[in-house]
């Protein structure tokens, strides 16, 4: 590599894509050297001087390392939009999250955030429904939505799965979804499960007078099969499909977004596998950026963490991810490594809090997230002493209490399902 891309006097253009990285150089490598090599490898340069890289080409496409802070090991790089294929998340990641993670000159490297210029944002449609559209589908305008995951994760027959879903719907759940590792196994085939569970959702709607949504997992071994399963759901009358975003991949997600828009189905995004590369604060890619890419592509709702449940993620991090999902304009937050982003009118995603939640946590969830959240419970519903329907009822009762500013203990005096939930889960 023959060039120095460190350029602290550079002012990014409105058309530049900007990345923030955390960089820890290898022994014997300066912070500036690691930064310039990373910038070159993620754009136009190679490990040695190449005659095919003309001065004219370099001047037009070279990256600019315009911010360096060795104390916090933070670097920001501005890239010309001409380096990227418009409308392609995979190509962007191949550049700024590709070979650079294999370089020997860094011990650790983390891509914290990307600011996309308006010229690139225009090539993406964002969520088809998003938060406001999901509220229209479900018919709930003024409270958090309540959902559950059918448990156990796997092992139930299609008939048993539908029965569990029915009990959850009847007890008060707005949404019932498959777990991430349930797709099309021999004990619970995709098409039979979808047909039976969508039928019982209709039954629960008729009985309760509320809309009931089943989120069936269409994660599949090929894009063709994934889209076929989407069509099956549409033919069965579904309003939703669920997808495991990381195992499925970015190209498949962009393909799915187009097909789902054609069919008029909302997309629920499960983030399983993300922690393989997001959890280490010194290496990998941030969950905030994963959320940003999901909104860019156009998923309608996304798991973001809970703060109070079993999943990793402190309050500041989770709320930064929430803001990236819902705000029209995200302000920069250097402490959380968040870059400013004007979303250019793309719809907000509905944040989903899920993982290790019980009805007793609803006051805290409501205090943290407010009304614009989907509260999703697994064991916190199905492990209720009185069964799944009672677990769902306890969640709705705890939510009603929180909305009315009443303590759970007081509300439980006239609500036996909540009383039983307090007896099981409330910390003594």
Swiss-Prot record:
The active site is at 151 (proton acceptor), 270 (proton acceptor). The keyword Magnesium applies. Substrate binds at residues 153, 271, 303, 354-356, 376-379. Catalyzes the addition of molecular CO(2) and H(2)O to ribulose 1,5-bisphosphate (RuBP), generating two molecules of 3-phosphoglycerate (3-PGA). Functions in an archaeal AMP degradation pathway, together with AMP phosphorylase and R15P isomerase. The record marks 310 as: Transition state stabilizer. Transmembrane segments: none annotated. Its EC number is 4.1.1.39. Because the Archaea possessing a type III RuBisCO are all anaerobic, it is most likely that only the carboxylase activity of RuBisCO, and not the competitive oxygenase activity (by which RuBP reacts with O(2) to form one molecule of 3-phosphoglycerate and one molecule of 2-phosphoglycolate), is biologically relevant in these strains. Active from 25 to 40 degrees Celsius. It is an enzyme of class 4 (lyase). NCBIfam families: PRK04208.1 (NF003252), rubisco_III (TIGR03326). Reversibly inhibited by O(2). Belongs to the RuBisCO large chain family. Type III subfamily. GO terms for biological process: AMP catabolic process; carbon fixation. This is Ribulose bisphosphate carboxylase. Mg(2+) binds at residues 177, 179-180. Pfam families: RuBisCO_large, RuBisCO_large_N. SUPFAM superfamilies: RuBisCo, C-terminal domain, RuBisCO, large subunit, small (N-terminal) domain. It catalyses: 2 (2R)-3-phosphoglycerate + 2 H(+) = D-ribulose 1,5-bisphosphate + CO2 + H2O; D-ribulose 1,5-bisphosphate + O2 = 2-phosphoglycolate + (2R)-3-phosphoglycerate + 2 H(+). It comes from Methanosarcina acetivorans (strain ATCC 35395 / DSM 2834 / JCM 12185 / C2A). The keyword Membrane does not apply. Binds 1 Mg(2+) ion per subunit. Keywords: Carbon dioxide fixation, Lyase, Magnesium, Metal-binding, Oxidoreductase. Its cofactor is Mg(2+). GO terms for molecular function: magnesium ion binding; oxidoreductase activity; ribulose-bisphosphate carboxylase activity. The modification N6-carboxylysine is found at residue 177. Homodimer. In contrast to form I RuBisCO, the form III RuBisCO is composed solely of large subunits.
